């Protein structure tokens, strides 16, 4: 029992110090009754994100109409080497599509 108590004390002492929470500089969200939305935020450590979603009519595999949400947005941060990175993306009935310097480009034939 003493060994268990000593092990717990050792773990508590060896634990890394808790990080301070990052301040939110800006945060907004707006949703419309029909399903469209906008949101964004920015933090004190340089992370930011913004996104919009709009409802549109699309056809499924059987050519039946249905509604989909088309999403467009971007996020930015600083990587471990100190380089700024921004990723722009959109998603619709064809899938998720993203572009940024950290995302590999498909090989061209």
From Swiss-Prot:
Keywords from the UniProt entry: Cuticle, Signal
Residues making up the signal peptide according to the UniProt record: 1-14
Record GO terms (molecular function): structural constituent of chitin-based larval cuticle
GO CC term, one of those recorded: chitin-based extracellular matrix
A Pfam family of this chain: Chitin_bind_4
Segments forming domain Chitin-binding type R&R: 34-107
Keyword Cell membrane: no
Role noted for this protein: Component of the cuticle of the larva of Helicoverpa armigera.
Protein's recorded name: Larval cuticle protein 1
Source organism of this protein record: Helicoverpa armigera
Lineage: Eukaryota, Metazoa, Ecdysozoa, Arthropoda, Hexapoda
